Amino acid sequence: MIEEKIKIPKWSIEQVAHVVRIAYKTIYNWIDQGLLDINVTDLPDHGIRRKRAKETRGTFSHGRSIEDRPAEISDRNTSGHFEADTVLSGKRKGQAVATFVERKSRLTIVKRLNGRDSTSMTKAILELANQLGDNLKTLTVDHGKEFANYNLIEEQTGVPLYFAHAYSPPERGSNENRNRVLRRFIPKGQPIDEITDDELIQINRYLNSRPLKCFNWRTPIEIFLRNLRY
């Protein structure tokens, strides 16, 4: 079970340790002793914390500032407030994916984009709004050019977009964190075009069925569905 959870849904050692009810240091010791068929490439970030990649997207400077976002959103007290971002393959052209992370539950929705342009992102957000309805209340984004159609998005969905300050990833910390987990399934350099729709669906399932320590080891989908009932 330990090897399966680390290699397939790509859980962290701490997540596995909680489920099997042993100390996470014990699992590390077993790996070091060669008792488990796990190596460093199977671990989150391959055991290495990497520097943030240099930003290559175009940007713009308009839109509603995150400073105007209600405090209840910042405090994660209410559901329905998402952060959005783009994850690229590492190539300058080709498909990408959009990631939408609900701030309260960390529910993560990954959608395919035909490109890194505003038309592709606008289509993805409109689809998301149609799927979630009233459960999509706001979006917090950066100033990447893919969000340049924010006026159109707000007009068609009624969902306000809040723009984080430039070079301030912590203002979209949920998105940054979940994107790092996503990279375990879509390594940088892997063409998004090679990922099938079924594989993308499975990645969404894996991301939302991972027990999180911040929720006392409940999963994002559990928290999200519970919030819908109250």
Listing of model-derived features with the role each one plays in the protein:
Residues 188-230:
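C-terminal domain-tail junction helix/linker
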Residues 1-166, 170-174, 184-191, 205, ...:
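Secondary-structure boundary/capping micro-motif
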